[in-house]
């Protein structure tokens, strides 16, 4: 009986040993499978991360190019707008010049005639009030023109300026160190507003020049 019991115990021990070995093998297989799955998962995640980074990098480069394109486009638009403003300003100045010249030129000849009358020397008691009246009218004309930024100028004694004067005659002499206006046949007019100034009618003058 004791021997049978020992044999049974021995068989159970062997069976348990085999079972333990089998379980160990199963556990090892499971661990290997889990390890492989974990490795595959890690590799997959790494690949997905790399793909995501590549995609983001591509999008970033595309966004940079688009920003540069927009900056270039904005710079061109701004330059075109500045050119448009400059052209518009130049055109406006040109139109205004022509408008002022056209308006003022219609008054200049009558004013010249009145000036000749006003400069008349007379001892006649009958004509004197008339001449004085013309002089007063001229002063009113000058005042109206000045309020409109139109200035009359008589450059006698000043250096000759070909931009605002027209020399109709000249003489040479040792007394002249430079070209100088010695007589004015007809006064000139210019328009001046802030820094904007241009000649409406050049003064017609006689000049003195150094001997050549």
UniProtKB/Swiss-Prot annotation:
Residues 40-60 have a biased composition (Low complexity). Pfam families: GrpE. Keywords: Chaperone, Cytoplasm, Stress response. SUPFAM superfamilies: Coiled-coil domain of nucleotide exchange factor GrpE, Head domain of nucleotide exchange factor GrpE. One of its GO terms (cellular component) is cytoplasm. One of its GO terms (biological process) is protein folding. Participates actively in the response to hyperosmotic and heat shock by preventing the aggregation of stress-denatured proteins, in association with DnaK and GrpE. It is the nucleotide exchange factor for DnaK and may function as a thermosensor. Unfolded proteins bind initially to DnaJ; upon interaction with the DnaJ-bound protein, DnaK hydrolyzes its bound ATP, resulting in the formation of a stable complex. GrpE releases ADP from DnaK; ATP binding to DnaK triggers the release of the substrate protein, thus completing the reaction cycle. Belongs to the GrpE family. HAMAP family: GrpE (MF_01151). This is Protein GrpE. It comes from Leptospira interrogans serogroup Icterohaemorrhagiae serovar Lai (strain 56601). The gene is grpE.
């Amino acid at each position: 009986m004791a021997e049978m019991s020992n044999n049974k115990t021995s068989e159970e021990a062997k069976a348990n040993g085999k079972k333990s070995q089998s379980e160990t093998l199963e556990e090892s297989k499971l661990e290997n499978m889990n390890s492989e799955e974990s490795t595959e998962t890690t590799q997959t995640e790494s690949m997905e991360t790399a793909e995501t980074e590549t995609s983001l990098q591509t999008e970033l480069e595309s966004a940079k190019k688009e920003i540069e394109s927009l900056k270039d486009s904005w710079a061109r638009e701004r330059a075109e707008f500045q050119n448009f403003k400059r052209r518009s300003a130049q055109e406006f100045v040109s139109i205004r010049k022509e408008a002022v010249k056209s308006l003022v030129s219609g008054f200049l000849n009558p004013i010249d005639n009145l000036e000749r009358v006003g400069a008349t020397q007379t001892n006649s008691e009958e004509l004197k009030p008339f001449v004085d009246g013309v002089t007063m009218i001229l002063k009113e004309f000058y005042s109206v023109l000045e309020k409109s930024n139109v200035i009359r100028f008589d450059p006698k004694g000043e250096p000759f300026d070909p931009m605002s004067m027209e020399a109709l005659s000249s003489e040479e002499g040792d007394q002249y160190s430079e070209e100088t206006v010695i007589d004015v046949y007809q006064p000139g007019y210019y328009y001046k507003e802030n820094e904007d100034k241009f000649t409406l009618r050049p003064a017609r003058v006689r000049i003195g020049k150094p001997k050549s």
